[in-house]
Amino acid sequence: QYKSVTYICDKRFLLVLMFVDYAVEPFYYERGVDFYANGQNYAMASLLTIAGPTLLGQPAFDNLLIAFQNGVKEKTPAAIKTLVDAARATQWRQLPEALGPLAQFAAPECLKAIANPGVDTDAALVVLQSLISRMEVMTDGNYRVEHDQSKNLLRYHELLLRFIDHDKDIEFRQTQITSIKFPLKLMEVSQVDSKASPAVQLADIMIGAAIEAANNITGLRSGGL
């Protein structure tokens, strides 16, 4: 009787996509290449996520992602050097297009992007924006969002309010099939205690079922619900 959408986010893929955005793309931009044209960034992130462990070595690839997260978080010369060393410790010559900017060149433009104070690897806002863009398409009228309590989302509360308050007509098209129009039909975003919200409890059950189904479909797990 009610419209619903279940949104599954592969956080590992999203982390790899961020790696491509900050540790790869600036190298190509500096050389006049539009790395975002035709979804090249998504293609490389997909290739790295699926084939990276095999081509680069599983432990080394895992260490690279850990070093990237730490480098983005700490932004110190030592953390950045550890990231470059981690890239060089992989079998990067198997995929030089992706790892060369760090492993071969320690490209200053990439290191500068990673050290930028405004850059982090928090996926909360990315996930919420994607979900909002989908809900905007599904809903016929105004709506509000109740979210389980999250310290990460609290960081973006003021930004979300600015999204909601934007009253000028404009459309942003992220891909051929994804766009978001302002003003939003979203009226409010609030955090609630899941223990006091049957709706959030039901959403938790749906999320668990969706994850279980996704694991079964991809072969990561069998059986389940």
Predicted regions and their residues:
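Phosphate-ester processing/binding pockets and catalytic centers
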Residues: Q1-L225
